[in-house]
Design a protein with these regions (language model features):
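C-terminal catalytic "cap/lid" subdomain
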Residues: 1-274
Length: 274
């Protein structure tokens, strides 16, 4: 029987902080921590922003070196704090395992298989993997050159800079039953300017029909929640990839409890094949 992981979930940076207070939102960490259990893989952004806030609080000013250097330095500082808070709130009877990934861990078959083994063993060993992109050691120009070289060899190359993509790629690798993308809105809207147009379900009987529906919705997707984010259009692209591989996809607001989103008892968008 094929091994499967129950859930791959992802939460974005801005959902983990209180911008008005320049601080971490500990309530979010608490809610998530109490809901996470073995059989789940949690992809968490937040290291860079949390590192920035921590540096600002300790020194009274932000770093003023180059963009790549700032991202590297903030991410290195924030990752430790990110993991500290997950460990603080996850049930102490469960192990917590940090997994930092880059694109080559999914584009190289041997490295991909190595990660698959790590994730499946975690479920068996009562451990919860917390995954993030390894920003402190990822240099933009080198990464671009590596990706260009890979794309010359084959078409199906993943970048995984966006943790929505990272979550979708992991969901495919571990044959996840559900992919949950937590974001700053309730889901996908027919009209992004009108909250009443939330689309509760995007489904079809065939892969071709589902892809057609998603492509139509992508035409109305504009903007993103913050600079550097890829927005709803990219989120739909990654969700489609998972749905076509047989994973049930849920996109919903991070303010809701994880279990309520999984039960679809709160506003959200569900994507999948009938």
């Amino acid at each position: 029987m094929q091994q499967r992981i129950d859930l791959v979930g992802k939460i974005g940076s801005m959902a983990l902080i209180r911008p008005e207070d320049h601080d971490i939102d500990y309530n979010i960490f608490s809610r998530l921590g109490h809901a996470l259990r073995p059989g789940m893989i949690w992809v968490s952004s937040g290291a860079t922003e949390i590192g920035r806030l921590d540096y600002l609080r300790r020194h009274g000013h932000e770093l003023d070196n180059g963009i790549d250097e700032m991202k590297t330095d903030y991410a290195a500082q924030g990752q430790a704090i990110l993991m500290e808070n997950y460990r603080r709130f996850i049930d102490p009877k469960y192990s917590v395992r940090q997994v930092l990934v880059e694109h080559q861990h999914f584009n190289d078959p041997e490295k991909r298989a190595h990660l698959q083994g790590l994730f499946f063993r975690a479920a068996e060993q009562d451990a919860i993997p917390i995954v993030n992109y390894n920003d402190p050691v990822s240099f933009t120009e080198n990464r671009k050159m590596e990706l260009i070289a890979l794309k010359k060899q084959h078409e199906d190359v993943v970048e995984c800079i966006d943790n929505d993509e990272t979550a979708a790629v992991i969901a495919e690798a571990v044959h996840a039953r559900t992919l949950l993308l937590m974001t700053g809105v309730d889901g996908i809207y027919a009209d992004p300017q009108d909250p009443s147009t939330l689309i509760r379900e995007i489904s079809a009987k065939t892969p071709e029909a589902l892809e057609k529906k998603v492509r139509e919705l992508q035409k109305s997707c504009v903007g993103a929640s913050r600079p550097g984010a890829n927005g709803a259009k990219a989120k739909l692209e990654y969700a489609l990839r998972s749905a076509l591989s047989g994973t049930h996809v849920i996109i919903g607001h991070a303010k809701h409890h994880l279990n309520d989103l999984l039960a679809e008892s709160v506003p959200c968008t569900v994507i999948g094949l009938d």
